[in-house]
């Protein structure tokens, strides 16, 4: 049983690597956030299923900003510290729509496979 749980935990990590961009885009589609706010929002919208570590989050935010999917500006966080705030760009909105459609197709296919007799 423990081995199956460890395997499931490893699978969750692999799934997160494949979905991190989509989760970041979705979190920011709900409003501007600083980096740690993005991590908190992802945890909220996935009901605690995904907890993004800073070592994964910040390189992804940087890469997505370089790709033109996000824009950013410096501001002050709720605890009065300087923080970089991220917003979804038009290109990011298009990317989110494409990734959402892709994951809906995958979800339907997996649900269909699991329901097969």
Describe the residue ranges of each PLM region.
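Amphipathic alpha-helical dimerization/coiled-coil segments
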Residues: 2-3, 93-117
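A cross-family signal for key residues in well-ordered alpha-helices
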Residues: 26, 40, 62, 97, ...
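Beta-hairpin "wing" of winged helix-turn-helix
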Residues: 65-82, 87
């Amino acid at each position: 049983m423990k081995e199956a749980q460890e395997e499931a935990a490893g699978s969750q990590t692999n799934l997160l690597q494949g979905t991190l961009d989509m989760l970041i885009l979705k979190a920011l589609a709900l409003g501007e956030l600083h980096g740690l706010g993005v991590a908190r929002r992802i945890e909220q919208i996935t009901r605690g299923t995904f907890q993004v570590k800073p070592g994964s989050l910040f390189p992804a935010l940087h890469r997505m900003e370089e790709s033109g999917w996000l824009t950013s500006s410096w501001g002050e966080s709720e605890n009065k510290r300087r923080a970089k705030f991220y917003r979804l760009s038009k290109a990011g909105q298009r990317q989110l729509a494409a990734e959402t459609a892709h994951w809906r197709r995958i979800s339907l296919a997996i649900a269909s496979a699991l329901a097969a007799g």
